[in-house]
Amino acid sequence: MVESLPTTFSDSVHIAVIGGTGLQSLEGFIPIATINPLTPWGYPSAPIHILSHNNTPIAFLSRHGTHHELAPHEIPNRANIAALRSMGVRTIIAFSAVGSLREEIKPRDFVVPDQVIDRTKGVRPFTFFEKGVVGHVGFADPFDERIAKVVRECGHALEGEGIVLHDKGTIICMEGPAFSTRAESHMYRSWGGSVINMSALPEAKLAREAEMVYQMICMATDYDCWHSTADVDVEMVMGHMHANGQNAKRLVGAVLDALNMRWSTIDSIRRRKNKPELANAQQHQIWRGRTYHFAWSISACYFSSE
């Protein structure tokens, strides 16, 4: 990114992309600003890049830091979500490298998960609800089916160009940074796990608490250790990561185009009905439907019923 970019951005940004291992930047997008918001939970993993995609501002955050210096248990997830929320973000598309727990999910394949099993150990701060702020959110369906549908449509449209996409799957989110034992890997398969990573949680839970729409896109780099014949070496994994990163950039561009098209249509309908207040900064409301409104200040957050 260009170092001389502005460090403030006054307009709301409604869509964010969180990049993980293998997707630490989004080349080809026009950089607008680089900001580093201070939240009640500290600074985010890295400065947030505001990029322009077809004249729409997009926020990009590198989950593991600018130079991939943060291990999964060191990621300031609350600060990341709070920083994006304070900028106006209401929709998050998150990418993550994963190990495959299924023969049919091959390295370089993409998975649009619909479920997650939490195998983290409580080491990571995992909620905004504390210190007198009490709240409970539903998490039966941890990812957003509306965004998932868009991702599936775009992914399948690109299948002739090297992208293979699986429509559903269950993530096993482990604590890390060590990988699974072979016994654990077989256990996760018996539970119905499709892929395994270290990043889905508490990121998805915090996004739900913050009333943000969240969908993860998984990029398989290798088979987990349950697989007896698929040897893994660093060179092979890095090759898969590079290919995944290139495919992810094409996929995210297509997804953003599709989302913008939907929002533009809703925007024009609302304007024709003489409701411009619903068509500008409040476009994100089409993705809402939660029980609480989330309000931020520099020092605290609170929830109030609708």
From Swiss-Prot:
Residues annotated as binding phosphate: T21, R63, H64, S96, A97, S199
Database matches in InterPro entries: MTAP, Nucleoside_phosphorylase_d, Nucleoside_phosphorylase_sf, Purine_phosphorylase-2_CS
Membrane spanning stretches: none
Keyword field contains Iron: no
Catalytic activity, reaction form: S-methyl-5'-thioadenosine + phosphate = 5-(methylsulfanyl)-alpha-D-ribose 1-phosphate + adenine
CDD domains per record: MTAP_SsMTAPII_like_MTIP
GO BP term (any one): glutamate biosynthetic process
Pfam families, sorted: PNP_UDP_1
Keywords: Cytoplasm, Glycosyltransferase, Nucleus, Purine salvage, Transferase
Class of the enzyme per the UniProt entry, highest EC level: transferase
Coiled-coil annotated residue ranges, if any: none
HAMAP family: MTAP
Quaternary data: Homotrimer.
Stored PANTHER family: S-METHYL-5'-THIOADENOSINE PHOSPHORYLASE
Family: Belongs to the PNP/MTAP phosphorylase family. MTAP subfamily.
Protein name as it appears in the record: S-methyl-5'-thioadenosine phosphorylase
